């Protein structure tokens, strides 16, 4: 009798263990929905009575890889804690980036402090032609084809914020057309509109396949 109880308890324990692991995996998947890039980590020394007190700062870029991105800054006594704070701040500052297919909608120049970054749309297959700091922002935002060039300071923090400034200036072709009182066809190149249509059709097909798989 006692042996039967032990087996039953063991099975229940195994089920509970599997449920716990499944729940943990679900939480990990939710946490891993975003792309994270640590751009810079610096050690900061503060002079206090009796010596110096050290802490760390982290600059992190977070995005969903589908048009949303944010930048955060964190400070703590340990590097992991500084990164965690930066990630949370980045998520609070998410903004949407207008995209046409896998590239940006139009050329733009962003500036922040001494940083100046120029972005230009690129044809499919070009890839992200950019330095490390700008690349981190563009990849997290979901830009796959773009030409980027730093025209100012090479400081990673300045480049990141200049890239963000450039992305925040981007507009949808419809917005530009409405402001100028023209049609979208008069504003946007035919290739851009064609790429957008193909991207929309591909996304719609993917949603239908996913829905069919669920059913």
UniProtKB/Swiss-Prot annotation:
Family that this chain belongs to: Belongs to the universal ribosomal protein uS5 family.
Q: What is this protein called?
A: Small ribosomal subunit protein uS5
Where composition is biased (Gly residues), the residues are 1-12
Which ranges are annotated Basic and acidic residues under compositional bias?
13-31
Which Gene3D superfamilies does the annotation name? 3.30.160.20, 3.30.230.10
Q: Where is this region: Disordered?
A: 1-31
Subunit field text: Part of the 30S ribosomal subunit. Contacts proteins S4 and S8.
Keywords of this entry:
Ribonucleoprotein, Ribosomal protein, RNA-binding, rRNA-binding
Organism encoding this protein: Cutibacterium acnes (strain DSM 16379 / KPA171202) (Propionibacterium acnes)
Mind telling me which GO cellular component terms the entry cites? small ribosomal subunit
């Amino acid at each position: 009798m006692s042996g039967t109880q032990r087996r039953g308890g063991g099975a229940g324990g195994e089920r509970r263990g599997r449920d716990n692991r499944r729940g943990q995996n679900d939480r990990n998947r939710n946490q891993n929905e975003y792309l994270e890039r640590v751009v810079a980590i610096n050690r900061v020394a503060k002079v206090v009575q009796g010596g110096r007190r050290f802490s760390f700062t982290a600059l992190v870029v977070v995005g969903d890889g589908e048009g949303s991105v944010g930048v955060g800054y964190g400070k703590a006594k340990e590097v992991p804690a500084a990164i965690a704070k930066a990630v949370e701040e980045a998520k609070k500052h998410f903004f949407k980036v207008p995209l046409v297919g896998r590239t940006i909608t139009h050329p733009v120049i962003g500036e922040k402090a001494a940083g100046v970054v120029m972005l230009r749309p690129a044809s499919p297959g070009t890839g992200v032609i950019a330095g490390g700091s700008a690349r981190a922002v563009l990849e997290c935002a979901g830009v796959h084809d773009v030409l980027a060039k730093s025209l100012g300071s090479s400081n990673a923090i300045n480049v990141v914020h200049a890239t963000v400034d450039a992305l925040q200036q981007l507009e949808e072709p419809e917005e530009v057309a409405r402001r100028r009182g023209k049609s979208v066809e008069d504003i946007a190149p035919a290739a851009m509109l064609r790429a957008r249509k193909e991207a929309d059709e591909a996304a719609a097909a993917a949603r239908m396949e996913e829905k069919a798989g669920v059913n």
